[in-house]
Amino acid sequence: MRYITPRKAAEGLGSAHEGTQHHWAMTVSAVALTVLTPLFMIVVARAIGLSQEQLLAYFGRPFPALITALFVIVGMVHFIKGTRIMIDDYFQGGTRKAAIIFSVIFGWAVIAAAVYALARMGLGAIVVL
């Protein structure tokens, strides 16, 4: 008689055979967003009403820039993984491939734009592209 754990019985099930890894990735990013969202709200609340020079100086400090960057990166990776599952469930064929490509490109473009903007604010005139 063999003893099979519930995890072993569930492993490999599903059409993609990677549901466990995806579930853990989504869970970890959701927990990270649970911590980062209130911190990001505090950062944004403190930035409201600042002049442009004060805002550049504020995001030039490490804590606000780091919290903002982490929030955008973790949030967009969570978005990419979530939209991938939604697209896999509701689209077929070429439309599925196009939608996945669009959502991944969009997510990484938002991450790149946010990190570039934070680097420009934090480093000032040093970063020129």
UniProtKB/Swiss-Prot annotation:
Membrane topology summary: Multi-pass membrane protein
Pathway: Carbohydrate metabolism; tricarboxylic acid cycle
GO molecular function: heme binding; metal ion binding
Topological domain ranges for the Cytoplasmic compartment: 1-22, 88-97
Binding, a ubiquinone: Y90
Compartment(s): Cell inner membrane
Cofactor note: The heme is bound between the two transmembrane subunits.
Binding site for heme: H78
Pfam families: Sdh_cyt
Gene Ontology CC entries for this record: plasma membrane
TM segment ranges: 23-43, 66-87, 98-122
Names of required cofactors: heme
Main subcellular location of this protein, as a coarse class: membrane
A single BP term in Gene Ontology: tricarboxylic acid cycle
Keyword annotations: Cell inner membrane, Cell membrane, Electron transport, Heme, Iron, Membrane, Metal-binding, Transmembrane, Transmembrane helix, Transport, Tricarboxylic acid cycle
Ranges in the topological domain labelled Periplasmic: 44-65
Quaternary organization: Part of an enzyme complex containing four subunits: a flavoprotein, an iron-sulfur protein, plus two membrane-anchoring proteins, SdhC and SdhD.
Role of this protein: Membrane-anchoring subunit of succinate dehydrogenase (SDH).
Designated name of the protein: Succinate dehydrogenase hydrophobic membrane anchor subunit
Source organism of this protein record: Paracoccus denitrificans
Gene it is expressed from: sdhD
